[in-house]
């Protein structure tokens, strides 16, 4: 089916629609979204198919923060009807300031968790976490590269 989105008219199959039973904080009235990839880029757009003006850039958090960790509560697992950890997809929302892409931040505190089997999704706000909603992507990548260098040096 063709949907009007912030990215233009896009053909989205019903089986590709993500269902947020509670919406997303700030957009609780919106329940149906689709992931629109950007060719040759790790960033995708989490696009509302109910409001053509809502699209959020998202990325796999481990591409930015190699030691990222997430613990799902029993309630989260039940809400998303997760049966197997291999059926889970995790994405983090990016904030890209207009005209200043070098100041892009990533929300590591509240990732989007997707059950890849049934397409249920939820933004999880981690409790008792050292993460925040705004980590500078540039800094996290540099920190991750430093961790990689240390692990290579230590294993030689």
Curated annotation (Swiss-Prot):
Keywords associated with the record: Bacterial flagellum biogenesis, Chaperone, Cytoplasm, Translation regulation
Gene3D superfamilies, alphabetized: BH3618-like (2.30.290.10)
A Pfam family annotated for this UniProt entry: FliW
Tagged with keyword Lipid metabolism: no
Any GO CC annotation of this UniProt entry: cytoplasm
Cellular localisation: Cytoplasm
Primary site of residence: cytoplasm
GO biological process, one term: regulation of translation
SUPFAM superfamilies tied to this protein: BH3618-like (SSF141457)
InterPro entries from the UniProt entry: Flagellar_assembly_factor_FliW, Flagellar_assmbl_FliW_dom_sf
Annotated function: Acts as an anti-CsrA protein, binds CsrA and prevents it from repressing translation of its target genes, one of which is flagellin. Binds to flagellin and participates in the assembly of the flagellum.
Family membership: Belongs to the FliW family.
PANTHER family: FLAGELLAR ASSEMBLY FACTOR FLIW
Quaternary assembly: Interacts with translational regulator CsrA and flagellin(s).
Record protein name field: Flagellar assembly factor FliW
Species, as recorded: Pseudothermotoga lettingae (strain ATCC BAA-301 / DSM 14385 / NBRC 107922 / TMO) (Thermotoga lettingae)
């Amino acid at each position: 089916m063709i949907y009007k989105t912030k990215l233009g008219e896009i053909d989205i199959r019903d089986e590709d629609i993500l269902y947020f039973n509670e919406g997303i904080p700030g957009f609780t009235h919106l329940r149906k979204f689709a992931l629109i990839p950007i060719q040759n880029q790790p960033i995708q757009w989490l696009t509302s198919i109910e409001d053509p003006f809502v699209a959020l850039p998202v990325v796999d958090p481990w591409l930015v923060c190699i030691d990222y960790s997430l613990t799902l509560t029993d309630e989260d697992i039940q809400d998303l009807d997760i049966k197997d950890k291999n059926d889970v997809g995790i994405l983090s929302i990016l904030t890209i300031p207009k005209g200043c892409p070098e100041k892009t931040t990533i929300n590591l505190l509240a990732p989007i968790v997707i059950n890849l089997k049934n397409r249920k999704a939820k933004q999880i706000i981690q409790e008792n976490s050292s993460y925040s909603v705004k980590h500078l992507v540039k800094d996290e990548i540099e920190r991750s590269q430093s961790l990689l260098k240390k692990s290579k040096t230590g294993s030689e």
